């Protein structure tokens, strides 16, 4: 599921630019820059900027008419918004707003704020296949360590800042010990107890990053790097083969969700022997160290999506 998000700027550029000053007046002529936005409660959200701002609730609207902003309190570089109705978990509330800095430069923007999930489950990526077939498609399994509601939980083929696919899960209660399967392809086959459709486009076959967040562009929960390459595989992209995979590896390194650092292709889980029926899964009982050693490739036909992981490893 892909949702558009865009920013409309007034009196400033969409990309960071050099600060401009009126030499005679000594005034700053660059508008504020929006740095981030997220829900902070069932009826509240926060927008962050690169400088002190002012904001009037009358300058903020919800275009779809389903909600309204009751107040907008600016404190230094942040604006706290209060809504008349709840921000529904797993749903996107669009707002249009205008803020000004201390000398009157303005920024107009439109963003989508995802509803606040007060009861997210504790999850980890548990198993995946990247070389799927029509009968055994690409899949990712999430293991529920502590129960909660899946609303807004987001799985990326990539990282939130660079991805090929984004799967935003709906409101759905899960319990500790559940296995949640995200399946890619034309349609769901209906063979797993808890499953969701990830889209028609599957995962990168040999090299990539799979990551899990508490909301679209939210806080990262877990991630895994997989590769069949080494640092010497190429000189241009650090061995990762393509610019986008290298970029995602850099983002993963910055997140702190994979080790060792610096991240190189050979520090990922070796995907060489993964097939449609030989999945890559966490080794049962192994500690979660955010390293390749936490994972193994299972024997042919032993993929265990929706069930306990296979302990045996494939040996060529």
Language-model-derived ranges and their functions:
Residues 11, 74, 86-89, 170-316:
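Solvent-exposed beta-edge/loop recognition patches
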Residues 97-99:
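Conserved structural position at the C-terminal beta-strand
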Residues 13-27, 38, 105-163, 202-204, ...:
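A structural motif detector for short, solvent-exposed N-terminal "entry" segments of globular domains
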Residues 1-11:
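Sec-dependent bacterial lipoprotein signal peptides
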Residues 64-72, 162-168, 218-222:
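Surface-exposed loop/edge segments in extracytoplasmic proteins
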């Amino acid at each position: 599921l892909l949702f558009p998000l865009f920013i409309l700027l007034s009196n400033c550029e969409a990309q960071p630019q050099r600060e401009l000053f009126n030499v005679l007046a000594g005034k700053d002529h660059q508008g504020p820059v929006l740095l981030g936005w997220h829900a902070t409660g069932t009826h509240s959200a926060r927008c962050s900027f690169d400088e002190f701002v002012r904001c009037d609730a009358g300058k903020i609207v919800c275009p779809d008419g389903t909600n309204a902003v009751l107040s907008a309190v600016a404190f230094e570089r942040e604006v706290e918004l209060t809504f008349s109705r709840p921000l529904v978990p797993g749903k996107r509330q669009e707002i249009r707003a205008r803020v000004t800095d201390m000398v009157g430069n303005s920024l107009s923007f439109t963003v989508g704020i995802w509803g606040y999930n007060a009861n997210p489950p504790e999850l980890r990526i548990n198993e995946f296949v990247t070389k799927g077939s029509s009968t055994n498609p690409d899949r990712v399994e999430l293991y529920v360590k502590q129960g909660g509601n899946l609303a807004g939980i987001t799985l990326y083929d990539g990282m939130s800042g660079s991805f090929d696919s984004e799967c935003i899960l709906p409101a759905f209660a899960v319990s500790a010990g559940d296995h949640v399967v995200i399946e890619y392809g034309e349609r769901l086959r209906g063979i797993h107890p808890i499953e969701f459709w990830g889209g028609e486009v599957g995962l990168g076959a040999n090299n990539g990053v799979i990551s899990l967040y508490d909301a679209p562009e939210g806080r990262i929960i877990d991630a895994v790097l997989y590769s069949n390459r080494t640092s010497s595989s190429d000189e241009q992209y650090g061995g990762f083969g393509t610019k986008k995979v290298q970029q995602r590896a850099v983002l993963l390194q910055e997140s702190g969700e994979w080790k060792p650092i610096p991240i190189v292709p050979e520090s990922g889980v070796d995907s060489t022997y993964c097939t449609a029926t030989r999945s890559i899964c966490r080794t049962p009982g192994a500690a979660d160290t955010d390293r390749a050693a936490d994972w193994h490739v299972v024997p042919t036909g032993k993929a265990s999506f929706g069930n306990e992981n296979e302990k045996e490893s494939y040996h060529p």
